């Protein structure tokens, strides 16, 4: 009698069970060709997750190849658990962003928590100690109960995991739009620091070397999680709650500390997190990168309950697990270490020279697959795109009611203060946070030095929807400006591409054009892509999200002394750097007045971005600028109001713009506060006003004046989200 009751080879083919797992007929036939026979149930499951969109990037790989991935600073780029970039003194910064969109839509707390846990393990698997977390979130409008529930759950999950494991959440962004109803975006980023000689790779090599499993015992949670993340959300998605993993931050903390100790052992050959596709992806990818084979004895895998089959073990996405390859004969040294940290561990296999991926359970073979086709030869699909029709109509902005629009935009949750939400995150644990949440970028000191790492995470949606190529440039440039605004030198970036179904021509074209724009911006701004993630099929009931590329970018501050007095003071002069044009297409103003965004804006000049960026950075480092704020969503008037509300300072400004241009979202602009007695030596910079301590906010363009108490602004800006979130459900 067989140990495990599973469908037969004949049943799999006759009933097309492979289709339920995510394989097409053509893909199944390709598996048959690779194996030279019909696959069994476990093998079908393994191919289905490894060839899923989430793991193989089969619809996006051609576009990812156009991203620049090297520079004088890049030590390790795409292909490993995270990117590694040199910061001098034989140290490096390690970082990556990942999505956990589908799980968060079904189980918001655990979906978000495990997203945080997974990205932390990616950083730790390189050998780096995490120093901070960031997140980029998108939800539907908060007037819907479902969206409030998702927002609460996701924010609580992020805070719950990060706070318990002891890593501060220092920056992020949150936006709200009906296009994310039922399909939130949860993108988590982690940044770590490592010494050059501690950098690890996920590789399995050395015939006879042992494979060690460490972490939580394997259960049935998260089975086919990678496949689930590669499908559209539907009414049936609720039934896939078992595909959502369960996180345990306390075990995560133990695993992190044990791993960081294990990397100091010279006998460690390779290490990889068990993330999407669990034991399957970690083991097969390590073997492929090592040019080796691997034999795993699944009866040695620590399991949570009796009767878990090889199929379930290989596809489980139980959290808090790592896979190591260690030199033969040194296994006990590692097992003793993990025992000291109260972690389950076991030797479950060895590296071979067969280039085959072999799984046995009590000597019975459950899979025998060539490594390279499994890990590296998933089919790649190049589809046909179709550009969205250009809107040639004109919107009328000649009679904008400035004061009415001003208050409505300031109170919109996308623009309003997110303090109510991010206060749930521990921002200071570790005591190295220099700049707390609320500004454009976070700054975290590199312990034992006077250096700091600045990091930011930024997404773009409406502009990418309207004009994908320009929108792609914009999202990279926005992250670049946010680092410049704290005086950092941008080094490199990670990206998460969140889109709908690539099988829809318009969405596929958005993917083509926006990644082309991103690649161009990366080249000009000298910010290579060192890691990333793709999340497609973000659709609910046939409606796609806006195409939303998210960029995480890091920069270096060589000496943080200037940050000791980097905040505005009464008496500072305010300057506007950058030109204000009639850029209303895709703006908050267009959405407010016309209910949708379907017009284009001016092209972004990347060479100007570099020139202005260097000038701004010099003003900061020369001690002339006391504060820099990028002009973002809502435009110039909203940016000044946010500045005033955040710092509790008055503003007296006169702007040479029309009423509508007060809300223009022209790219490449900064507000610079310059210390009393100093001047800003930047060509075409306009002095527009003064920082006051009179509690008054006053901005005029000679035609219209907006005047409010700063306390009133603060009530509107700070109070908007709490009011939405505490509405009666």
Curated annotation (Swiss-Prot):
One GO location term (cellular component): cytoplasm
Active site: 54, 100 (proton acceptor)
Entry keyword set: ATP-binding, Cytoplasm, Ligase, Magnesium, Metal-binding, Nucleotide-binding, Purine biosynthesis
Pfam family membership, one: AIRS
Pathway as given in its UniProt record: Purine metabolism; IMP biosynthesis via de novo pathway; 5-amino-1-(5-phospho-D-ribosyl)imidazole from N(2)-formyl-N(1)-(5-phospho-D-ribosyl)glycinamide: step 1/2
Binding site for substrate: 99-102, 121, 245, 317-319, 535
E.C. designation(s): 6.3.5.3
Positions bound to Mg(2+) 2: 122, 273
Class of this enzyme: ligase
Gene Ontology molecular function: ATP binding; magnesium ion binding; phosphoribosylformylglycinamidine synthase activity
Localization: Cytoplasm
Similarity field: Belongs to the FGAMS family.
UniProt protein name: Phosphoribosylformylglycinamidine synthase subunit PurL
Species, as recorded: Staphylococcus carnosus (strain TM300)
């Amino acid at each position: 009698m067989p140990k495990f009751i599973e469908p037969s080879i004949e049943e799999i083919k006759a009933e097309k069970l492979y289709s339920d797992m995510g394989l097409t007929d053509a893909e199944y036939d390709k598996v048959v060709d690779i194996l030279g026979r019909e696959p069994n149930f476990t093998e079908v499951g393994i191919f289905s997750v490894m060839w899923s969109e989430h793991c193989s990037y089969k619809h996006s790989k051609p576009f990812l190849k156009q991203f620049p991935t090297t520079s004088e600073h890049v030590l390790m780029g795409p292909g490993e658990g995270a990117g590694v970039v040199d910061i001098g003194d034989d140290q490096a910064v390690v970082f990556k962003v990942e999505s956990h969109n589908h799980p968060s839509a079904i189980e918001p707390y655990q979906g978000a928590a495990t997203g945080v846990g997974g990205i932390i393990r990616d950083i730790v698997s390189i050998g780096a100690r995490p120093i901070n977390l960031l997140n980029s979130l998108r939800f539907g409008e908060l007037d819907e109960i479902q969206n409030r529930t998702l927002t609460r759950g996701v924010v609580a999950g992020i805070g719950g995991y990060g706070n318990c494991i002891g890593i501060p959440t220092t920056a992020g962004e949150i936006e709200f739009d009906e296009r994310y109803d039922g399909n939130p975006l949860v993108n988590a980023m982690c940044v770590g620091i490592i010494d050059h000689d501690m950098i690890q790779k996920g590789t399995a090599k050395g015939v006879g070397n042992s494979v060690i499993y460490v972490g939580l015992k394997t259960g049935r949670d998260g089975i086919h999680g990678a496949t689930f993340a590669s499908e559209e959300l539907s009414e049936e998605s609720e039934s896939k709650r078992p595909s959502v993993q369960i996180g345990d931050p306390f075990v995560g903390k133990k695993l992190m500390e044990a791993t960081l100790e294990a990397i100091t052992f010279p006998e460690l050959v390779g290490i990889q997190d068990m993330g999407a596709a669990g034991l399957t992806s970690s083991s097969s990818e390590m073997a492929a990168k090592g040019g080796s084979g691997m034999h795993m004895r699944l009866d040695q895998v620590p399991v949570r309950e009796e009767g878990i089959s090889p199929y379930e073990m290989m596809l489980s996405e139980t959290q808090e697990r790592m896979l190591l390859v260690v030199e033969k004969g040194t296994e006990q040294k590692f097992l003793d270490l993990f025992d000291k940290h109260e972690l389950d561990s076991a030797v479950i296999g060895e590296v071979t020279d067969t280039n085959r991926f072999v799984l046995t359970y009590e000597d019975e073979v459950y899979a025998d697959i060539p490594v390279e086709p499994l890990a590296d030869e998933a089919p790649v699909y190049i589809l046909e795109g179709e550009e969205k029709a250009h809107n040639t109509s004109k919107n009328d902005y000649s009679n904008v009611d400035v004061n009415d629009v001003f208050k409505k935009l300031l109170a919109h949750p996308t623009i309003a203060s997110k303090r109510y939400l991010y206060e749930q995150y521990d921002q200071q644990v570790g005591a190295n946070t220099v700049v707390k949440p609320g500004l454009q970028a976070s700054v975290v000191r590199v312990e034992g030095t006077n250096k700091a790492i600045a990091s930011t995470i930024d997404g773009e949606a409406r502009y990418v929807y309207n004009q994908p190529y320009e929108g792609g440039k914009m999202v990279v440039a926005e992250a670049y400006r946010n680092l410049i605004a704290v005086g950092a030198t941008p080094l490199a970036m990670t990206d998460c591409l969140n889109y709908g179904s690539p099988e829809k021509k318009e969405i596929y074209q958005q993917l083509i054009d926006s990644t082309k724009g991103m690649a161009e911006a990366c080249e000009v701004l000298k910010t290579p892509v060192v890691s990333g993630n793709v999340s497609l099929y973000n659709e609910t009931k046939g409606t796609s999200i806006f195409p939303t590329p998210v960029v995480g970018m890091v920069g270096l501050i060589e000496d943080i002394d200037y940050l000791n007095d980097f905040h505005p003071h009464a008496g500072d002069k305010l300057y506007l750097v950058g030109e204000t044009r009639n850029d209303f297409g895709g703006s908050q103003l267009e959405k407010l007045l016309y209910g949708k965004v379907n017009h284009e804006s001016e092209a972004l000049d990347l060479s100007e971005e570099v020139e202005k960026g260097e000038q701004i950075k010099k003003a900061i480092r020369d001690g002339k600028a006391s504060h820099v704020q990028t002009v973002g969503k809502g435009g110039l008037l909203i940016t000044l109001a946010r500045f005033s509300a955040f710092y509790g300072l008055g503003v007296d400004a006169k702007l040479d713009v029309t009423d509508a241009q007060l809300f223009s979202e022209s790219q490449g602009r900064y507000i610079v506060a310059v210390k009393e007695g100093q001047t800003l030596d930047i060509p075409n910079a306009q002095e527009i006003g003064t920082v006051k301590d009179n509690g008054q906010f006053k901005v005029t363009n000679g035609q219209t004046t907006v005047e409010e108490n700063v306390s009133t602004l603060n009530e509107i800006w700070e109070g908007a989200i709490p009011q939405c979130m505490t509405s009666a459900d």
